[in-house]
Each structure stands twice: as structure tokens, then as C-alpha cells.
Amino acid sequence: MLERALNRIMLMVIASRFPETEKPLPLKTEKCHNIGCLYSISGFLMALTAALKAQIAAWYKALQEQIPDFIPRAPQRQMIADVAKTLGGEEGRHLAIEAPTGVGKTLSYLIPGIAIAREEQKTLVVSTANVALQDQIYSKDLPLLKKIIPDLKFTAAFGRGRYVCPRNLTALASTEPTQQDLLAFLDDELTPNNQEEQKRCAKLKGDLDTYKWDGLRDHTDIAIDDDLWRRLSTDKASCLNRNCYYYRECPFFVARREIQEAEVVVANHALVMAAMESEAVLPDPKNLLLVLDEGHHLPDVARDALEMSAEITAPWYRLQLDLFTKLVATCMEQFRPKTIPPLAIPERLNAHCEELYELIASLNNILNLYMPAGQEAEHRFAMGELPDEVLEICQRLAKLTEMLRGLAELFLNDLSEKTGSHDIVRLHRLILQMNRALGMFEAQSKLWRLASLAQSSGAPVTKWATREEREGQLHLWFHCVGIRVSDQLERLLWRSIPHIIVTSATLRSLNSFSRLQEMSGLKEKAGDRFVALDSPFNHCEQGKIVIPRMRVEPSIDNEEQHIAEMAAFFREQVESKKHLGMLVLFASGRAMQRFLDYVTDLRLMLLVQGDQPRYRLVELHRKRVANGERSVLVGLQSFAEGLDLKGDLLSQVHIHKIAFPPIDSPVVITEGEWLKSLNRYPFEVQSLPSASFNLIQQVGRLIRSHGCWGEVVIYDKRLLTKNYGKRLLDALPVFPIEQPEVPEGIVKKKEKTKSPRRRRR
């Protein structure tokens, strides 16, 4: 009787949230790939407990009262319903749900996620792809929810490099030479460059000591340049962990301890992947509810985490092995372990390292034969297939480096257990050195194991060597990365955690989830569901797409003339003074720099990626527009994500061209070879879906709210002249299209410049 009464009350509450013209459909749809399906919150709540029904509906109602001008949206209610059904185990294994801008996806997964986490006594982990969104959820969205859930406990798990190291900060803030000398003995570069830097560090230390600052780089108003932050922070290899005097007050470890008590943990994809691999940091996978926001990044993040690269220059490698043998000898002499590892015996260790060096030297000789002598170069092995001789060397290197990794780990554990009867400074220095050696051999072991594999996740492993010049010296590197990571994601995530939500404003390309399914390993036959929500905006009325009548396509051969025409049309738009806030997006840094050469007289108006950190550029852009000034942000594809500028802040977006993936990337080339071997067309499977995805994100910068308006200018006639152009346009929101004429662009003479070489992927 009680449950029936609660059900009736809940239905009345929820019905009050639906306008009469927006009644939920009585039938439940199993899958929704297209526009139009609508779940009501009441439809799913009937399958959950009365307590959960009451809790979710009450929080949703209270939230509306907290947010000024809150607009109830059917897509948001649908998302709450779908998320709850998945996390509650009522429907499907995992859920991939595309929630366009304006749906309010963050709160749509937090409300049911927190309710179900409490009901099942689990931890809700929300993972993002970048620090900006992670900090927004931690600093804005969760504090908002805490107003309606006063006892909510949440924390953030940022990467170690985002936190200040109190040991390093103390050294850099100190004015006492003895204190600096003591800490500098443990590590290099722990003295301030000048008095101003020392005072800045002293102010940071004061804020940290008085709890005005939590130690996160993004949470202080004090300017910290990258060079100073590199010395203020630390990494795993340079951290003393529990052996550090500052361990209990260290912001990084304080945050890690808070995870054990938190109901909600805000993390990032790389940390989640690492935590699932090592079974550390986060609670047991079976006790997690996981939401992967910006989930379209997951396959790339997983691939980056599994990519291995290492320097293998023979003289450099000899030096590292010599340093390690001396380090082991010092440990044996000064901190002798109770049980001596056989490999630590000098004769055995020297012979082991000598064999390792000879293999590295042989590999150097072989790889150098594939590249022009005495200069920077690169060689990729077709389909990831190594010559037999190289493969045998890699297999042996995997065994030898793994043995050294085990030896370094054994000594590190032994050193960490030593008592205070030893010279603490000398002990800590050895711990740091052994920790770094462990990191090196761990990475090397993974590299050679991956190099020894023919396939990973049913696809080839890309393998290539590079020769790079640094300070006048040539260095040899070896690289490996799998082109598919679905097996790893299945093992670490899909099979380990009962229910996962994968969400983003853009999950589909070309109106299909197929690319996401292929890259991530999510699949309908495993019980995974794929849902695409409606956009709450009226794009037809709020904006339009402008495709200027360019005289040439944006090919490499025509790039100069194309950019000249683009600059001429852009200048015309600026001079019209119709728009205060503008954004210009480029497919390459080369094209962006060439465009800037054509608009030097407008340079003061342009805020260009790389001039300052992105958040500083956006702050300045906001200030300019607020003061009635015109302002133009100029950047690459990264500026097409996470940029939320509403109204006059951004009313015109300029897109240089369709952003197909780079054709010179070793990974892209190997994937193309593999697809051809399977009689699949790389352009259809690889290039076009990627281009569609990029274009959707770029166009999505314009309409961010019901009050937004403006134009998206795309300088690429192929959208109208090529067969695939229609498919790309069909995947975009429905805008009216205009085709204005373009002023003739005067091609400038191109200055010859040597572009710096970078390692390609």
C-alpha cells in the first residue's frame, strides 16, 4: 500500500513537470539512434524502489528552484531516465548517450548517479578528458548539488602533476641557504632563479600552510609560468611517497585519502585507465558506478596510455646501465638487504647489462640502415611487421629489461622499509634514484613486450624508429602503439565495472555510432545501448551556415591561394562590424600561421593559440566583448572543444577546411594498410568519420543557448561539390545555407622557413 501511494505521489510530481503538450510516450523504446524517442522519468522510475523514485524526483525539483531561469527540457528528463535505468541495472550493460549542447548532461547523470550510488553503497566516479571540465564539475556543478544535498561528500582526483610538491615548494620559498642546500642535495634545480621568484613561492607556501590554497595549480591567482611549475610539482619517479617528511600534508596524498570517504570522485580518463590497470587510487571496480564524460576521447586516451616510446641511443643507454650498476653497488654497500638477489651480485649484473647493451648496439646498427645517415629521419615498419632479426632482439630485450625492473623494484621496496637509524638524506637520495631507474626499466619492458606482439585487439601494432637532433647530437628512439585498444578497454572497463555511462555532446559521426563501437569495443550484442538525444535548440531560426564561393579547393597545391581568399573574406566580415566575438579554426598550425601573415594589420584584434594559455585568451576575449570591443580567437582543433561562449561572445565561427586526419601519421598509415588488407576502404572507415566528428564539434561552438545566434563560415567548396560533402552536411544541425561571393585574394610571396621537426603519431 505504501509503495503504491508513493508511486501515485511520484507520478503526480513528475506529471507536473511535463507541459500538457509534452506527455511522455506510454511505450518504452529499447534503442534510440534517431531523433524523436522520449522517455519520461516516471516510465523508468516504476522499475526502481520507492525511495529512489522519491529521491531523484525531489532532487530534480529542488534543482529547478536553485537555477535561475531554469527551462525544463524533455531531452534532459530522458537522459536522467536512461542513466538511471543503466546504473540501476534495469536495462543493458553499458550506455553510450549523445547529449547535445543545452541538454544539461552533467546534472543529468549526477542526480541519478548519486542516488543509485547511495542506494547500492557504491562510489560514483565521473571521468573527463581534460582538466577544464574536471575542474568545472568539481568547482561548480557538485557545489551546486551540495546546496540540495547538504551531506554530499565529493573530491577530485587530479594527476600528480597538477599538485604542488610541498618539499619542492619549501626549497624554492626558503631564504636560508642551508635549507636550500639540504633539499637541493635530494634533487636538482630546487633553488629560485631570482628574488622575485622566491617571494612568489613564499606567498604560495603561506597560502598552502594556512589552507587558503589546496595545492592545485588551477586554484591560485598567483601567476606560475611553466618553468616554475615544472620545479614546483613532481612526478611519480621523483616522489618519495611515504618516505617524505611532507607526506601527511602533501596536497596530492591528502586528495588521494579523501577518495576513500567520498561518494563522488571526479577524475580523468588517463587516471581511470591507470587505476584500473594497477587496482590503486579508486575503489574496487565492482563497487564503482562510472560515468565517462567526453567519452569520445576514451579510445585515444587509452591508446596514448598504451603507447610506448624510449630513447635507445647506444652511448646514452650505456651510461644509464653504468649508473644503475653503481646504484646497485651503493645499495649493497650502504643499505645491504637481508636477502641478496642473485642478479645483484656484481659479476651477474655486469654480464646481464653487457648483454643488454650489445643488443641495443645491434639494434642501433640495424635501425640506422633504414634511415639516411647523419640527419633527422624516420622509418616505419609496414603493417607493424619487424624483420626477424629485429623481432628476436626485441623479445630478448623484453626479458632482460623486465629482470632489471624487478631488481629495481626489490631494492626500492627494501630502501623504503629502512629505519631512521640511517642517514636520512642519503637514503632518500637513493630512493629517488632507484625510483627513476624503476620507471625507466618499467617503460622499457613494456616497450619491448609491445614490440614483440604481432597484433593487439585484433589489429597490427604500429612500430617506427626516429632519429632526432638535440643540442647538436643525434638521438635514436623506438616507438610502439596499437591502432586498436578495444581488448584493453574490455578488460579494464567494460568487463570489470558492472555499468558504465559513456556520454558527450558528440559521440556519432555521419549520424552513426559505428566508429565509436569499432574503436571502443562497445557493442549491442553485449547488451550495450546507444542513444542520441534531441537538441533543445532551434538551429534553423538561430543561425546559418555560410559556404563562400571559393575559387579553389583547400588542397596542398592550392593552399596559398585558398588562404589568400579566406583572408579576404574574413577581412570583409571584420569590416562589416556585425559581430563582436568571432572564432577562427584551422586544420593545421602551418595554415594558421600563413593566414596570420595575410592579416597582420588585424593582429591586435586576434587572440592566437600559443600566445598565452587558453584560459587567459578566453578571459581577455570575454573582457573585450563585455567592453563592446571586437575580439577574435584563433586556434586549432583543440579550440573546437570545451569552448562555451554564449550570445555576443561568439556569433561567427570561421572554419578553414574539412579537417581530415593527417596522412603522415605512422598510426594512420598503418591503420590504412590494415584496412586495405581487409578489403575495407580507409577513406570511408577512417578519414570521413573523423572529419565528420571534427566538423560537428567545430560547428557546435556557435549555438550554446536559446539566446545564441550567428553564422558558421566554412571555406570548403567540397561540401557542395563532392559526394561525401552532402553526408558531412547531413550530420550537422539543420541550418539554412548561404553561398556569398568571395573578394579576390592577393597571394603573398611565401618566405622560406625551416619548420621544427616533431615526432608524428
Q: Where are the predicted features?
A:
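Conserved interdomain hinge at the start of the Helicase C-terminal
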Residues: R551-A587
